[in-house]
Amino acid sequence: MDENNHGVSSSSLPPFLTKTYEMVDDSSSDSIVSWSQSNKSFIVWNPPEFSRDLLPRFFKHNNFSSFIRQLNTYGFRKADPEQWEFANDDFVRGQPHLMKNIHRRKPVHSHSLPNLQAQLNPLTDSERVRMNNQIERLTKEKEGLLEELHKQDEEREVFEMQVKELKERLQHMEKRQKTMVSFVSQVLEKPGLALNLSPCVPETNERKRRFPRIEFFPDEPMLEENKTCVVVREEGSTSPSSHTREHQVEQLESSIAIWENLVSDSCESMLQSRSMMTLDVDESSTFPESPPLSCIQLSVDSRLKSPPSPRIIDMNCEPDGSKEQNTVAAPPPPPVAGANDGFWQQFFSENPGSTEQREVQLERKDDKDKAGVRTEKCWWNSRNVNAITEQLGHLTSSERS
């Protein structure tokens, strides 16, 4: 459609110029469009009728603005600003052959400006290399940004999954909490159930009493060592029954303390009497003195090794013959005046300490059975004490007779 050759014939004119010339030169439409008085321009007198009647007939559209843009493309200009008058130096009445000099202008777009500038100002080699490096750098930055964007999208998806999971767990916890609250409310509604919800203080809520482990009778049952009795007092209770129980516990504790003092005093007096009697016996005998035992060892060892019948002691039993061979024969004691000379002679000659002390010395060699050693010693001391008591009873009865 464009004509760039100046030597073309009139038959090769653009259709827009040919149709425009015919439309303006038609005398039947002079009331709408016509030539000016100078015959070098044309005037559109009635644009609405021009758009409604003439444009559809010649150009197959009714847009007056589009017609004006096409005139500007072919070099037409507005001759009078107060009316629609357009002119071109080669568009003259009666001279259609001049229109061959009218050429359509190429539209200038924004993206074509760099190409024009490049044609006008060619780049040097250094500038071209610099531009290429910049293009490569920008391309790499674009790729890095795209990768980072992809990672951000993946992290966002992971976060969304975690948030969804946390919401589900929260809903589950709320459901469990509601279930527990409903269960507790149902339990509290039951008759005969009372719960003390007052805060408890650990220091005053429970008190431990450690009872002594001293036992003075070998026939009592064995108890665990260091056994403690815990007396729990409820701070929040204010009923009379709780005060009564506390009072009874205090009375029991005071009575236990009294009995403990009484037993300890009796134990000390018995040990003192036994030590005095042992000294009298040891002065007249040639056997080595056995180490004294405390009251605690006596009670504990007597329970660890209790004989089948601790209350029955055979004072007339004869010592083992094999052990008597190893012992040194003691000289006979001097005769004692009185009716019970035979008794004293038998008592001092049949002292069981010689055999029992040897057993104790043999058992001390075993380091793995220390409890057994204490049991044998305590058993001998308990037998010795019981024997002395019974012999004293025989002595008093014989003297009376």
Curated annotation (Swiss-Prot):
Organism superkingdom = Eukaryota
- Locate the region Hydrophobic repeat HR-A/B: 122-188
Record the organism: Arabidopsis thaliana
Subunit comment for this entry?
A: Homotrimer.
Q: From which residue to which does any coiled coil extend?
A: none
Keyword presence, Phosphoprotein = yes
Q: One Pfam family name from the record?
A: HSF_DNA-bind
In the record, biological process GO terms are: positive regulation of DNA-templated transcription; regulation of DNA-templated transcription; response to reactive oxygen species
Q: Name one GO molecular function term.
A: transcription cis-regulatory region binding
Q: Where is this motif: Nuclear export signal?
A: 388-395
In this chain, composition skew of type Basic and acidic residues spans 356-373
The record's family statement is: Belongs to the HSF family. Class A subfamily.
Matching Gene3D superfamilies, A to Z? Answer: Winged helix-like DNA-binding domain superfamily/Winged helix DNA-binding domain
Whichever gene encodes this chain, its name is HSFA4A
Report the function annotation for this chain.
Answer: Transcriptional activator that specifically binds DNA sequence 5'-AGAAnnTTCT-3' known as heat shock promoter elements (HSE).
PTM info: Exhibits temperature-dependent phosphorylation.
Q: What is this protein called?
A: Heat stress transcription factor A-4a
Per the record, the domain comment is:
The hydrophobic-rich region (HR-A/B) corresponds to the oligomerization domain. AHA motifs are transcriptional activator elements.
Q: Where is this motif: Nuclear localization signal?
A: 207-213
